[in-house]
Amino acid sequence: MTVKTLRVTQVRSANGRLETHKACLRGLGLRKPHHTVEVRGTPEILGMISKVSYLLKVEEI
């Protein structure tokens, strides 16, 4: 099974969000709006992306 690589960009601010959502952003390596990281599509990462999907733009590489 191959693991997909995803490009994740934070498009909205984390100000005023739940602490658990801020923790998910930190876990993904995102710090501020318009910051982009490339992550592997493991089940753990996909769960974090799902939880804060309203703050992100996700592209498959």
Swiss-Prot record:
Entry keyword Protein biosynthesis: no
Pfam family, one: Ribosomal_L30
Subunit record text: Part of the 50S ribosomal subunit.
Keywords of this entry: Ribonucleoprotein, Ribosomal protein
Family: Belongs to the universal ribosomal protein uL30 family.
Name of the protein: Large ribosomal subunit protein uL30
Gene Ontology terms describing biological process: translation
Gene3D superfamilies the record matches: Ribosomal protein L30, ferredoxin-like fold domain (3.30.1390.20)
Domain of life assignment: Bacteria
Key word Ribonucleoprotein present: yes
Annotated SUPFAM superfamilies: Ribosomal protein L30p/L7e
Gene Ontology MF terms in the entry: structural constituent of ribosome
Signal peptide interval: none
Classification via PANTHER family: LARGE RIBOSOMAL SUBUNIT PROTEIN UL30M (PTHR15892:SF2), MITOCHONDRIAL RIBOSOMAL PROTEIN L30 (PTHR15892)
Any one of the GO CC terms: cytosolic large ribosomal subunit
InterPro entries the record matches: Ribo_uL30_ferredoxin-like_sf, Ribosomal_uL30_bac-type, Ribosomal_uL30_ferredoxin-like
